[in-house]
Regions:
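Hydrophobic/aromatic-enriched cytosolic interaction surfaces used to assemble or bind macromolecules
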Residues: 1-351
């Protein structure tokens, strides 16, 4: 089954994700790069049956909209393959065959689509992204859409939504984006010229958003005119994984806070690895900076990564394209923010 693509529409648009019994939604008006948020929210199904949950959503006024759906990273795989030497109309079938050893379900159980890597020129011309979603995931989404009489125009993925958001401020330059919400994974993307070149899921320690990431006392001891390379934090780090004695201090943690700091360094290491790989691979596209989003802790995350990676790290801002952001609660923003990127999509494909 081919992922649908958006057609022109007007009026209010609903963007949703439906994963882990949580419906996240944003209702907006507008077009292009100028939107106004009408309302938003996060609704948990809990112990309700689908019928009862749908009734609750109807009572919230979420029935009958033109709707875009975004799949969360846990609902699909984004694979990168060598572009098969076939005609454009045969790309999907050829890509389906190539990924058979990269997925753990039967190919007949997958919905796939193919996307070019970057601008499709030079080094990027030999690569393709393949989106692979289990048919059961798509059916689950469309079942809810049917009950609520949504006119689903597109099913998008978070990688592409994140690309759209990070391209708002500096669309032509290469930028890295990291968006963190509650959960055990975060998504890191690198885009340039409004095109996605690199995407990677990074594991997070359990409870990451509530952990202590850095210690003020340690920061005060650091030289003010330099940053400490990541390698000094992780003397036992190896490419094959983390050892059981992973620690930033080289000694047994003295407190729960220090234990949190040690575990948080794993994210720092993986961010640095991704940046290093980018700089080695795409020498013609120097990284202009990193943009992060982590709800109320966005500024803290930006300062931490800026100090310890030496990159220009700032908070991801979307205000230029979206009015009414105060309609999204602080608590809901980490989950709702990626949905805004779906509103910015401008790909148009022929049926």
């Amino acid at each position: 089954m081919r992922l649908p693509w958006r057609r022109a529409s007007s009026g209010e648009r609903l963007v949703v994700s439906w994963s882990g019994q949580a419906l996240v939604y944003v209702l907006a008006t507008g077009a292009g790069n100028d939107f106004t948020i009408v309302r938003s929210g996060v609704e948990l199904q809990g112990a309700d049956s689908l019928e009862d949950f749908s009734r609750r959503l109807v009572q919230l006024g979420l029935k009958g909209y033109v709707t875009d759906v975004m799949l969360r990273p846990e609902q699909y795989q984004l694979l990168q393959i060598e572009a098969p030497a076939v005609a454009p109309e045969e790309l999907r079938s050829a890509a389906r065959y190539q990924i058979k050893e990269m997925v753990d379900v039967h190919l007949d159980d997958l919905t796939i689509d193919v996307l070019k890597v970057g601008d499709g020129q030079g080094r990027a011309a030999s690569q393709l992204f393949v989106v692979a979603a289990n048919n059961a995931v798509v059916r689950d989404v469309m079942s809810l859409a049917s009950v609520l009489q949504w006119d689903v125009r597109v099913i998008d993925v978070q990688d592409m939504a994140q690309r759209n958001l990070q391209s708002i401020e500096e669309p032509e330059r290469a930028t890295c984006a990291l968006m963190i919400s509650e959960g055990r994974q975060t998504l890191l993307t690198i885009s340039a010229g409004t095109e996605l070149y690199y995407s990677r899921r990074l594991d997070l320690p359990e409870g990451f958003m509530g952990m202590t990431w850095t210690a003020g006392s340690l920061a005060q001891q650091a030289p003010v005119d330099a940053y400490t390379p990541v390698e000094e934090y992780v003397p036992g780090y190896a490419a094959v994984g983390y050892g059981g004695e992973f620690s930033t201090s080289g000694a047994t943690p003295a407190s729960a806070e220090q234990s949190d700091i040690d575990r948080a360094q794993r994210l720092l290491v993986e961010v640095q690895r991704s940046i290093d790989l980018w700089e080695r691979t795409w020498t013609n596209l120097p990284l202009a900076g990193v943009r992060v989003a982590a709800g109320e802790r966005s500024e803290e995350l930006a300062q931490w990564l800026s100090r310890d990676t030496g990159q220009a790290v700032g908070v991801l801002h979307t205000g230029a394209s979206f009015k009414g952001l105060d309609q999204i609660s602080v608590a809901d923003m980490p989950l709702c923010l990626p949905l805004l990127g779906v509103l910015l999509r401008n790909e148009v494909r022929k049926a």
